[in-house]
Amino acid sequence: MLLASSVAAQTPKWQDLYKVKKKDTIYGIAQKFGITIDELMQANPDMQKNDYVLKKGEQLLIPFPKQVQTAAATTAPKSSATQQRAANTVNVGVMLPLHNVDGDGQRMIEYYRGVLMACDSLRNQGINTNVFAWNLHKDASVAQVLADANAKNCDLIFGPLYTKQVKPIGDFCRKNGIRLVIPFSINGGDVETNDHIFQVYQSRVLTAELSVNAFMDRFKDAHPVFVDCNDTTSDKGVFTAALRRRLEAEGIAYNITNLKSSEPMFAKAFSAKKRNVVILNTGRSPQLNSTLAKLNTLRASYPNIQIAMYGYNEWLMYKRVYQDYYYKYEAYIPTAYVYNESAPATASLERHYRQWFKSDMRLALPRFALTGYDQAQFFIRGINKYGKQFNGTPQQNTYKPLQTPLKFKRVTNGGMQNNCFVLLHYKPTRTIETITY
């Protein structure tokens, strides 16, 4: 409801997200925020419908008055003293594709909605925000966006989505003392040279390194069994090769078998005395299914054999199909997020999202709105408390995430990289243990 039309302009800017009270009127809300009724209706397209009725609890985007926006674009830059943010107010910029043209835009609109919901929650806790949003689509002019006077006054900026836009925005943020939060996957190593960048996404190499470290921490006394799944499209060689090197360096023996091996040959790869940890060299579902079938046969022949599995983030997408097997074979699934729809706080936010935006969150893992909510909560709280000293380390964390934990570590001579790593341990008791590193 709120964003379908409002993000079409290059630089929509909102001064507040307002919850309608019992005796509110459209005129009264406009007067309260110093805007015209037309400006309020333009920011909230549903208000332009013939059958529209203002309802208690409804969420309305409150734009800045047009005359204020014009003045901001034409006046001279403020002095450093006047640019200092007001106490308990954080200026937030969002530079992402905010449109309904394609999947990129639709996903980022949901992420942005999560950011707005976080700002609304924080306001109730005494932390105010000014949110400035720019529709930075794939072919947008980065220079035009950065020329907006409001961009310089941001305390932090979420974005961009596209790799080619990172360097100019990163340079701008470094020049103006702004924290740049890159929320999704990008290519390039700007975080290694720009100390104002917070990179949430973990590269394949970093993910493999963290996964190997967690494996060695949990399974030093186990017997690893690598299963070659004959998948020529797999990208998991980065992890399996790194794990085998570590095992060899520490003198830990392991076996390799193949999905095409006969049942007796497959069984020979397993230890009768130690706990066996099965590692596939692909994350795809068909090969996982075939491996589980072989493990079922193995367990039938050797009921007392100890088996665990060390998987991949993709396995969470197959949870509805294989969850019983995850419990049966004690699957350990590495991930950077934990989505639990039954958790009261998560269920509450999803319910409020449905009420505010008249739609459900996209069926994606992780949920984009929850990602935006968690990241906004984490960074806005941190900057409000620590100002320019905020660096996102565990010692400064003041927020318990709904889905997406964050833990940043300084890259040598560069910015901050998210190093948070989680193992989900599916226990035979049909409970899930969350192990956070």
Model-derived regions, located:
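Extracytosolic ligand-binding ectodomains
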Residues: 10-437
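N-terminal signal peptide c-region/cleavage motif recognized by signal peptidases
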Residues: 4-6
